UniProtKB/Swiss-Prot annotation:
InterPro entries: Eph_TM, EphB1_SAM, Ephrin_rcpt_lig-bd_dom, Ephrin_rcpt_TKs, FN3_dom, FN3_sf, Galactose-bd-like_sf, Growth_fac_rcpt_cys_sf. Receptor tyrosine kinase which binds promiscuously transmembrane ephrin-B family ligands residing on adjacent cells, leading to contact-dependent bidirectional signaling into neighboring cells. The signaling pathway downstream of the receptor is referred to as forward signaling while the signaling pathway downstream of the ephrin ligand is referred to as reverse signaling. May play a role in axon guidance during nervous system development. May also play an important redundant role with other ephrin-B receptors in development and maturation of dendritic spines and synapse formation. It comes from Gallus gallus (Chicken). A motif (PDZ-binding) lies at residues 982-984. Glycans are attached at residues 315, 407, 480. This is Ephrin type-B receptor 1.
Length: 984
């Protein structure tokens, strides 16, 4: 950059000459005939010449190195005549650094001392007189460089000693590297260094919309004002592309650039868009998504449609599901499948997630195949399976995965394995064993089969001592096994040899057959020495017991005499009522006898003795499922330490209760806690140390038997219904053996679990303690509440409740089961029911009821309670029916029992009906009213012509309902043919 150039001057230069007669400023012309200002001197003929010429003040403007360029002419000394020997053809160039003006016309210093010599200037060519005469300046050019340190300016001085010279032009300038954009970084103009070899570092900054890649960003400026050695660089950031390598331009709408770099903007991938400039990413359109691992350059994809064409193959309690892939994969190739399993109630109105026991092969989630095998399901249970199709973007969608559902109901299956056996006692010749019910009975357990044999070696396994062992090695005696059967979960193996080890296995049987045998367990009979030792240990106890027995008998005789005398004067009904709860019948030897909690002076003591206290923190209440006498009933979960979580039913005592109500509420737990039978509802425990007070029992998925049967009218076979009745009878037999009288046996008080196992429940006494006139089921009688339709006549008339009166109630339950939950005695009043029974009328057989079952009902309804069958006999009779299903094929009719008058409700009087609605109501099929009317069957004449195909067409699909309606239509036709004009 030029600091001074005399060629551009249009006025006097104003330099300082010394002496004044030395250098003279004159005008001249350059080679191009341009006017220029020059200085000349030629005092060669005068001695001692020392002519100085000093430039004006030159501002260096930060330059570290200043260059001077001079154009001049020098006279050839030889062309001058008589020139003295001091004539020279050179002159000297000096410079001086200063911060201010150092010379004027009046003052200056003219010695070499303060100046720094740049060079002695000599011309390449000197000129003669002729050349110089035309004032056309031709001459030589000389360039010199001077380094400037810290001063702000410099002055140049030319000293001519006895020379004839003219300074045609003088220029001072410096070099710099210009501002430049390189590698998308801008570098400022930079002065060269003080030395010609200097490299000056210049820091760069990224241009707008560019970002550093390598740091630091710098260039080097060399002494010639040239950039060199680039280090570091910038590139255009995401959303911008390079333009001519000097700028970063925003990506237009509809394009994007995902990352920093030299790449160009690209069009948005399919199913995406960018509505603004400089987009680093194209947003997916509605309904389309990117997976977390999808690059921005990938197309947006959607979720798959649901699987298609599901095929289900049910095999007892397992199922195979197969399906076709979805029609739409969403544009992806990572489709997998999830299986959602839901276990439902019989009416499918409520479903819940399957428990963790259900097994899926190969897996439940993330299936890549279109097939899954599902096992360990419950028998006779409706299930809904959802097959979800998912892909890499399904988790991005706000909607649940597309799926296809399939409803299935599992079949009857054999029971699961009995988990373990325990030895109750042993003698020299026998072993008494017990075992829990299989975890999955898959129906009603009919009986158990035990297989046992004598082990040749007395050693079972090294880690087993005493009575219980695990699987022993194979034994040749195994092929000579003996078999025993038991109708309960206890058995006594007799006829054994003393001191021998026996290997025992057990399996359960339902109507579906036998389950698998349990693992082999080892048990040992007593040796003669063992028996004698045990006898010696028990002898003092036996003697003491005998003595106590004598005292007890004497006391009992004395008490009996006193009580018999008092009985003549006492008519206390309540006491005798309580007494019958535990003093009826005779218990078997060694059988535990029921103890009435109301005989305790402190009823809370009975609760503590018979019911386990549960910490409320182990209980989780989920939803209300009903209401009881004392409060609401909930479904919940119970997780006891060391045990798996189970569903439970939770009865609560409402707030504001009295102490009497609390005692009455907990009395049911005191009763239930004494029972342990697979057909009796199981008490888990009570919560009495916090509020609300709770009774916790096992949860029965299908609820009360009467409503369950009504919901599944016609859906069960006769053998299944008999299996249910057998379970109820087994539970009642157990209660009778405990000397407990239920008093309120009815289908509404039988609960059904998911395996169709029926369990007797409702042991509360609230109905005797509260007079709720809103419930017509119970009628006041002698100060108590009695369910008339289910109660034996002697109990209604005299409050004589015994196990025999429970047998009468059991006969009514049989009728309820075989009629699929119909109300006993239909819409007759309680008084009409009492009158009919007194006149020896009995209920007729339900539709399609086997004659053998109806006969058993009639046996239960014998007026003389002593002639009714015992509950043990009923269990045996039902077992025979189950073993011989052919005995159930004969269907009972009203005319088949001429000796017993029956209430006749099987053929209603159709002449009394005025509409189809009345007729449907009479046959308990009102739910099909709209089906009949919308299909055009608006009169009884049209209904009488209907066929089974017509019923299917209008939506009557249940086989039991079809049969009931067709039987009624057949009877209607008979009455119409007998009285053709009697019906409108």
């Amino acid at each position: 950059e030029t600091l001074m150039d005399t060629r551009t001057a249009t006025a006097e230069l104003g330099w300082t000459a010394n002496p004044p007669s030395g250098w003279e400023e004159v005008s001249g012309y350059d080679e191009n005939l341009n006017t220029i200002r020059t200085y000349q001197v030629c005092n060669v003929f005068e001695p001692n010449q020392n002519n100085w010429l000093l430039t004006t003040f030159i501002n260096r403007r930060g330059a570290h190195r200043i260059y001077t360029e001079m154009r001049f002419t020098v006279r050839d000394c030889s062309s001058l005549p008589n020139v003295p020997g001091s004539c020279k053809e050179t002159f000297n160039l000096y410079y001086y650094e200063t911060d201010s003006v150092i010379a004027t016309k009046k003052s200056a210093f003219w010695t070499e001392a303060p100046y720094l010599k740049v060079d002695t200037i000599a011309a390449d060519e000197s000129f003669s007189q002729v050349d110089f005469g035309g004032r056309l300046m031709k001459g030589x050019x000389x360039x010199x460089x001077x380094x400037x340190x810290x001063x702000x300016x410099x002055x140049x001085x030319x000293x001519x000693x006895x020379x004839x010279x003219x300074x045609x032009x003088x220029x001072x300038f410096f070099k710099k590297c210009p501002s430049v954009v390189q590698n998308f970084a801008i570098f400022p103009e930079t002065m060269t260094g003080a030395e010609s070899t200097s490299l000056v570092t210049a820091r760069g900054t990224c241009i707008p919309n560019a970002e550093e890649v390598d740091v630091p960003i710098k260039l080097y400026c060399n002494g010639d004002g040239e950039w060199m050695v680039p280090i570091g660089r910038c590139t255009c950031k995401a959303g911008y592309e390079p333009e001519n390598n000097v700028a970063c331009r925003a990506c237009p709408a509809g394009t994007f650039k995902a990352s920093q770099g030299a790449g160009l903007c690209a069009r948005c991938p399919p199913n995406s868009r960018s509505s603004a400039e400089a987009s680093p990413l194209c947003a997916c359109r509605n309904g389309y998504f990117r997976a977390d691992l999808d690059p921005p350059t990938a197309a947006c994809t959607s979720v798959p449609s649901g699987p298609r064409n599901v095929i289900s193959i049910v095999n007892e309690t397992s199922i195979i599901l197969e399906w076709n892939p979805p029609r739409e994969t969403g544009g992806r190739d990572d489709v997998t499948y999830n299986i959602v399993c839901k276990k439902c109630r019989a009416d499918r109105r409520a479903c819940s997630r399957c428990d963790d026991n259900v097994e899926f092969v190969p897996r439940q989630l993330g299936l890549t195949e279109t097939r899954v095998f599902i096992s360990s399901l419950w028998a006779h249970t409706p299930y809904t399976f959802e097959i979800q199709a998912v892909n890499g973007v399904s988790n991005k969608s706000p909607f649940p995965p597309q799926h296809v559902s399939v409803n299935i109901t599992t079949n009857q299956a054999a029971p699961s394995t009995v988990p373990i056996m325990h030895q109750v006692s042993a003698t020299m010749r026998s072993i008494t064993l017990s075992w829990p019910q299989p975890e999955q009975p898959n129906g009603i357990i009919l009986d158990y089969e035990l297989r046992y044999y004598e082990k040749l070696s007395r050693i079972c396994t090294p880690d087993v001592s005493g009575t219980v062992g695990s699987r022993p090695a194979a034994d040749h005696n195994e092929y000579n096994s003996s078999v025993a059967r038991s109708q309960t979960n206890t058995a006594r193996l007799e006829g054994l040899r003393p001191g021998m080890v026996y290997v025992v296995q057990v399996r359960a049987r339902t109507v579906a057959g036998y389950g698998k045998y349990s693992g082999k367990m080892c048990f040992q009979t007593l040796t003669d020495d063992d028996y004698k030792s045990e006898l010696r240990e028990q002898l003092p106890l036996i003697a003491g017991s005998a003595a106590a027995g004598v005292v007890f008998i004497v006391s009992l005789v004395a008490i009996s005499i006193v009580c018999s005398r008092k009985r003549a004067y006492s008519k206390e009904v309540v006491y005798s009522d309580k007494l019958q709860h535990y003093s009826t019948g005779r218990g078997s030897p060694g059988m535990k006898i029921y103890i009435d909690p109301f005989t305790y002076e402190d009823p809370n003591e009975a609760v503590r003795e018979f019911a386990k206290e549960i910490d409320v923190s182990f209980v989780k209440i989920e939803e209300v499922i009903g209401a009881g006498e004392f409060g609401e009933v909930y479904k919940g979960r119970l997780k006891l330490p060391g045990k798996r979580e189970i569903y439970v039913a939770i009865k609560t005592l409402k707030a504001g209760y009295s102490e009497k109500q609390r005692r009455d509420f907990l009395s049911e737990a005191s009763i239930m806690g004494q029972f342990d039978h697979p057909n009796i509802i199981r008490l888990e425990g009570v919560v009495t140390k916090s509020r609300p007070v709770m009774i916790i029992t096992e949860f029965m998925e299908n609820g009360a038997l009467d409503s369950f049967l009504r919901q599944n009218d016609g859906q069960f076979t006769v053998i299944q219904l008999v299996g249910m009745l057998r379970g109820i009878a087994a539970g009642m037999k157990y209660l009778a053996e405990m000397n407990y009288v239920h008093r309120d046996l009815a289908a509404r008080n039988i609960l059904v679990n998911s395996n169709l196992v029926c369990k007797v429940s409702d042991f509360g006494l609230s109905r005797y303690l509260q007079d709720d006139t809103s419930d017509p089921t119970y009628t006041s009688s002698l100060g108590g509440k009695i369910p008339v339709r289910w109660t034996a006549p002697e109990a209604i008339a005299y409050r004589k409740f015994t196990s025999a009166s429970d047998v009468w109630s059991y006969g009514i339950v049989m009728w309820e089961v075989m009629s699929f939950g119909e109300r006993p005695y239909w819409d007759m009043s309680n008084q009409d029911v009492i009158n009919a029974i007194e006149q020896d009328y009995r209920l007729p057989p339900p539709m399609d009821c086997p004659a053998a079952l109806h006969q058993l009902m009639l046996d239960c309804w014998q007026k003389d309670r002593n002639t009714r069958p015992r509950l043990a006999e009923i269990v045996n009779t039902l077992d025979k029916m189950i073993r011989n299903p052919a005995s159930l094929k004969t269907v009972a009719t009203i005319t088949a029992v001429p000796s017993q008058p029956l209430l006749d409700r099987s053929i209603p009087d159709f002449t009394a009906f005025t509409s189809v609605e009345d007729w449907l109501s009479a046959v308990k099929m009102s739910q099909y009213r709209d089906n009949f009317l919308s299909a055009g069957f608006t009169s009884l004449q049209l209904v009488a012509q209907m066929t089974s195909e017509d019923l299917l067409r209008i939506g009557v699909t249940l086989a039991g309902h079809q049969k009931k309606i067709l039987n009624s239509i057949q009877s209607m036709r008979v009455q119409m043919s007998q009285s053709p004009t009697s019906m409108a």
